[in-house]
């Protein structure tokens, strides 16, 4: 899994002009699933996300997790995180998991995440418009194969 984590003040995702998911303070996640991803990748990602201390405490130190601040997560599927740009000018996406596997894995990821913190999502495979207000900005890349 490859996940882009953005600390946000608020975020929302719309599909065909209708708001699908909306959060206040927390994380906007762009989530890519790879063909080799297993349940251990899912477990690792969830554990890291809910415990990652990148929110400021009373002294202004990044010392609090999304759980600590009672934040929310907006999770968006993003196969383009597996883009291969080595050849030519058009990215290849053959490094991403096949849609059926990726959709099931993405759903399982969101369900497990929702056991820890409130989660809103987009719709897998849909053309989505994502709006956010970055907080910081703080943007972190989590790759479950690099641990």
Swiss-Prot record:
It is found in: Cytoplasm. A motif (Gly-cisPro motif, important for rejection of L-amino acids) lies at residues 136-137. An aminoacyl-tRNA editing enzyme that deacylates mischarged D-aminoacyl-tRNAs. Also deacylates mischarged glycyl-tRNA(Ala), protecting cells against glycine mischarging by AlaRS. Acts via tRNA-based rather than protein-based catalysis; rejects L-amino acids rather than detecting D-amino acids in the active site. By recycling D-aminoacyl-tRNA to D-amino acids and free tRNA molecules, this enzyme counteracts the toxicity associated with the formation of D-aminoacyl-tRNA entities in vivo and helps enforce protein L-homochirality. The lineage of its organism: Bacteria, Bacillati, Bacillota, Bacilli, Lactobacillales. GO terms for molecular function: D-tyrosyl-tRNA(Tyr) deacylase activity; Gly-tRNA(Ala) deacylase activity; Ser(Gly)-tRNA(Ala) hydrolase activity; tRNA binding. Belongs to the DTD family. Keywords: Cytoplasm, Hydrolase, RNA-binding, tRNA-binding. It comes from Streptococcus pneumoniae (strain P1031). This is D-aminoacyl-tRNA deacylase. InterPro entries: Daa-tRNA_deacyls_DTD, DTD-like_sf. One of its GO terms (biological process) is D-amino acid catabolic process. Homodimer. It catalyses: glycyl-tRNA(Ala) + H2O = tRNA(Ala) + glycine + H(+); a D-aminoacyl-tRNA + H2O = a tRNA + a D-alpha-amino acid + H(+). Its EC number is 3.1.1.96. A Gly-cisPro motif from one monomer fits into the active site of the other monomer to allow specific chiral rejection of L-amino acids. GO terms for cellular component: cytoplasm.
């Amino acid at each position: 899994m490859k996940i882009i984590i953005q600390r946000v003040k608020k975020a929302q995702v719309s599909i065909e002009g209708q708001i699908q998911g909306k959060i206040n303070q927390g994380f906007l996640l762009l989530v890519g699933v790879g063909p080799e991803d297993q349940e251990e990748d899912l477990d690792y990602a969830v554990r890291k996300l809910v415990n990652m201390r990148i929110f400021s405490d009373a002294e202004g130190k990044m010392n609090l997790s999304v759980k600590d601040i009672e934040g929310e997560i907006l999770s968006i599927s993003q196969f383009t995180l597996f883009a291969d740009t080595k050849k030519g000018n058009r990215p290849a996406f053959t490094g991403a998991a096949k849609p059926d596997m990726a959709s099931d894995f993405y759903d399982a990821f969101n369900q497990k995440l929702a056991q820890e913190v409130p989660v809103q999502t987009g719709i897998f495979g849909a053309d989505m418009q994502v709006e956010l207000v970055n907080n910081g900005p703080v943007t972190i890349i989590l790759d479950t194969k690099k641990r």
